[in-house]
A protein has these predicted regions:
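Glycine-/small-residue-rich active-site loops that bind phosphorylated ligands and cofactors
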Residues: 23, 46, 74-75
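Structural micro-motif
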Residues: 58-67
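Non-catalytic, surface beta->alpha helical segment in thiol-disulfide oxidoreductase systems
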Residues: 69-95
């Protein structure tokens, strides 16, 4: 799946697709905040087309949190360590 350009976050940050009721999303946001990881949140129940995008990334399931990285790759319900490692990998690759 090709991530639409409007959902590619700037270097050093991630875009998080979430919902207001998602406990995993709240947990990950708290971890990202405490670790100083920059992110933009997009509620898939409020932004047209994003639920479909998340479903496409996740084999037909609207699973959140789904994160998009600066290289256009994604991860579903990742740990903080995974997010930090992926951001470091993207940065070292110069993306």
């Amino acid at each position: 799946m090709q991530t639409p350009p409007e959902y590619i976050p700037p270097a050093g940050s991630v875009l998080m697709f979430s919902t207001t009721w998602c406990g995993y999303c709240r947990n990950l946001k708290g971890q990202l905040d405490r670790a100083g990881v920059s992110y933009t949140e997009v509620n898939i129940e409020e932004v047209d087309g994003t639920a479909e995008l998340v479903a496409e990334v996740n084999g037909g399931n609207q699973t959140v949190p789904t994160l998009i990285f600066p290289d256009g790759s994604s991860a579903t319900n990742p740990s903080l360590a995974t997010v930090q490692a992926r951001l470091a990998d993207v940065a070292s690759a110069g993306r």
